[in-house]
């Protein structure tokens, strides 16, 4: 059975037609946004998404290493290692990466949200953010289960250190906050240091200037 989200994304993505010196050229909407240095991180985080996001980041760096990249996030989270590959690429490249949550940034999504450039991490007013510790289920021999449990504990410590680095909270505060699912409003996320500003609207031209 096909994933209904994949089916939707593959069949209902709008196309944008532009006039060029060589005639008309059609882009899917996400490719057109990429031309404006906007990346959409939407849906669960997994290896396939990670590869696409990292490739877009590296492409935009190669195109202009000094111009800002904007990342719009609406994600429930997902695979930790996939998310960390995106995180590492964000820190590795030369352009500053601005992050903006639209909808939700949960689990690994919240880590990628706070990984944006300091002062350039934003939320729309009704977005939700959720932080928690990593989880996983394993089966097999008892020894293998213990090995996986130790690895999960190492990942937990590493993720906590990343939140400490980007939020300014101390380790004890982060550990307590991530012990269980911890949902935050945009205001809570700002107070906790996950984001820097809440954006309600873009700057609009003065109505009298029409």
Swiss-Prot record:
Q: What is its main location?
A: cytoplasm
Q: Which UniProt keywords apply?
A: Cytoplasm, Hydrolase, Protease, Serine protease
Catalytic activity entry: Hydrolysis of proteins to small peptides in the presence of ATP and magnesium. alpha-casein is the usual test substrate. In the absence of ATP, only oligopeptides shorter than five residues are hydrolyzed (such as succinyl-Leu-Tyr-|-NHMec, and Leu-Tyr-Leu-|-Tyr-Trp, in which cleavage of the -Tyr-|-Leu- and -Tyr-|-Trp bonds also occurs)
Main function: Cleaves peptides in various proteins in a process that requires ATP hydrolysis. Has a chymotrypsin-like activity. Plays a major role in the degradation of misfolded proteins.
Mention any one GO cellular component term assigned to this protein in its UniProt record.
endopeptidase Clp complex
GO molecular-function terms, A-Z: ATP-dependent peptidase activity; ATPase binding; serine-type endopeptidase activity
**GO BP, one example?**
protein quality control for misfolded or incompletely synthesized proteins
Q: Where in the cell is it found?
A: Cytoplasm
Record NCBIfam families: PRK00277.1, PRK12553.1
| Similarity section | Belongs to the peptidase S14 family.
Q: Quote the catalytic residue positions.
A: 107, 132
According to UniProt, the name of this protein is ATP-dependent Clp protease proteolytic subunit
The record's section on PANTHER family has: ATP-DEPENDENT CLP PROTEASE PROTEOLYTIC SUBUNIT
Q: Which gene encodes it?
A: clpP
């Amino acid at each position: 059975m096909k994933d209904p989200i994949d089916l939707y994304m593959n069949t209902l993505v709008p196309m944008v037609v532009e006039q060029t010196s060589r005639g008309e050229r059609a882009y899917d909407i996400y490719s057109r946004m990429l031309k404006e240095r906007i990346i959409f991180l939407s849906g669960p985080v997994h290896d396939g998404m990670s590869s696409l996001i990292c490739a877009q980041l590296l492409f935009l760096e190669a195109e202009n290493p000094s111009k800002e990249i904007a990342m719009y996030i609406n994600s429930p989270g997902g695979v930790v290692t996939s998310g960390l590959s995106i995180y590492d690429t964000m820190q590795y490249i030369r352009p500053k990466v601005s992050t903006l949550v639209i909808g939700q940034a949960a689990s690994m999504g919240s880590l990628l949200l706070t990984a944006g450039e300091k002062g350039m991490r934003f939320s729309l007013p009704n977005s939700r953010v959720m932080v928690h510790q990593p989880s996983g289920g394993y089966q097999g021999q008892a020894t293998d289960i213990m090995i996986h449990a130790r690895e999960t504990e190492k990942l937990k410590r590493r993720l906590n250190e990343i939140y400490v680095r980007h939020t300014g909270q101390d380790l004890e505060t982060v550990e307590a906050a991530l012990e269980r699912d911890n949902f935050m409003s945009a205001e809570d996320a700002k107070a906790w240091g996950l984001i820097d500003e809440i954006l309600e609207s873009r700057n609009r031209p003065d109505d009298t200037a029409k």
